[in-house]
């Protein structure tokens, strides 16, 4: 009599794909190297517990710990075959996951892990690191505000000042969008002081100079620009009018209106391979200096006055205030006189400007 085979039925979904990708990134090994555990720890290592837990979060779209253990229990064979590890349900109890979270909350070890992961990923995938985008966002929630907690009342980007929020600052490879550094801070914190530590971590992890850091107007503080310039890197950001010398904006615009400046066209390559005019403007230079770590740093800011081309191909972004500018060490300004009581409109042309420069 033929023996009846033992058939295992499990829902696979995208789990093998997620786990394979994380293994190629070296995630389990890097986590184990940077977050050592107590000698009495048994079962799966912290790195593998974290990796499988992350695959659960990504596959289910749910970060709650209470659902992880039963999720694993229904996929023991799939997880074991995919990872090559002896996966057990007891490796994912709430107590075990809480220990993992406490270990991962060590800021010093996390910074070292983040740096090692960036270096490994950039090297393995031969990623371009020419441009880094730095920006912050906030997330509101129906949470309880506690002293020293992450959720605090602050300036709400969600237009919900009645809700506490948490703030996230992140630096990503542009245009890929791969995170390089992430900081989660309490919601009442201002954006301006968050740029320097985030950029410094990216510089330490990549170990390269000559990168272009792209940010919004809150990255335009002179301290932030001085640190980037002193490090041998470059920046592209809107420069608020308060950062300009008195009369500089008016003089720069008047030079255009009087016809004293020749405007240079800026083109962008379309998906069909054709070039389209997206803006025109001119450049001038301004000597800059600022004290950084006790030493006076000097650099030359290349400032661009730019008028966006009026065409349906552009997607303008409304601005409430107005004229602002961009600096790469460079500034982009509107060249037209804005109509009275109407917002100034902007279009971002960083890649095209880089090619032009």
Where are these regions (language model features)?
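Anion-binding and metal-coordination hotspots
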Residues: 1-20, 25-357
């Amino acid at each position: 009599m033929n023996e009846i085979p033992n058939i295992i039925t499990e829902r696979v979904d995208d789990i093998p794909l997620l786990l394979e990708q994380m293994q190629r990134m070296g995630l389990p090994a890097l986590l184990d190297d940077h977050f050592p555990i107590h000698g009495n720890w048994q079962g799966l290592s912290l790195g593998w517990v974290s990796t499988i837990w992350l695959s659960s979060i990504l596959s289910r779209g749910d970060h709650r710990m209470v659902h992880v253990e039963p999720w694993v229990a229904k996929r023991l064979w799939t997880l074991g075959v995919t990872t090559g590890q002896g996966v057990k349900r007891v490796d994912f109890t709430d107590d075990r996951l809480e220990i993992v979270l406490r270990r991962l909350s060590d800021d010093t070890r996390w910074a070292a892990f983040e740096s090692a992961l960036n270096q490994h990923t950039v090297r393995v995938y031969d990623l371009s690191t020419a441009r880094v985008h730095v920006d912050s966002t906030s997330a509101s929630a129906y949470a309880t505000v506690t002293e020293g907690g992450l959720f605090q009342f602050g300036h709400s980007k969600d237009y919900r000042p009645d809700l506490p929020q948490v703030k996230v600052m992140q630096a990503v490879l542009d245009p890929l969008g791969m995170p390089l550094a992430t900081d989660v801070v309490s919601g009442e914190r201002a954006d301006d002081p968050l740029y320097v530590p985030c950029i410094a971590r990216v510089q330490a992890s990549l170990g390269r100079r000559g990168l272009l850091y792209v940010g919004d107007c809150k990255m335009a503080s002179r301290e932030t620009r001085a640190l980037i310039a002193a490090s041998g890197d470059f920046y592209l950001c809107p420069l608020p009018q308060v950062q300009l010398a008195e009369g500089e904006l008016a003089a720069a615009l008047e030079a255009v209106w009087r016809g004293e400046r020749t405007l240079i066209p800026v083109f962008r390559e379309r998906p069909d391979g054709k070039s389209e005019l997206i803006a025109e403007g001119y450049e001038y230079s301004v000597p800059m200096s600022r004290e950084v770590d006790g030493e006076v740093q000097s650099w030359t800011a290349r400032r661009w006055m730019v008028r966006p081309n009026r065409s349906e191909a552009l997607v303008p972004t409304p601005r409430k205030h107005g004229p602002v500018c961009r600096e790469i060490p460079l500034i982009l300004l509107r060249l037209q006189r804005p109509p009275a009581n109407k917002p100034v409109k902007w279009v971002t042309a960083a890649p095209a400007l880089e090619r032009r420069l």
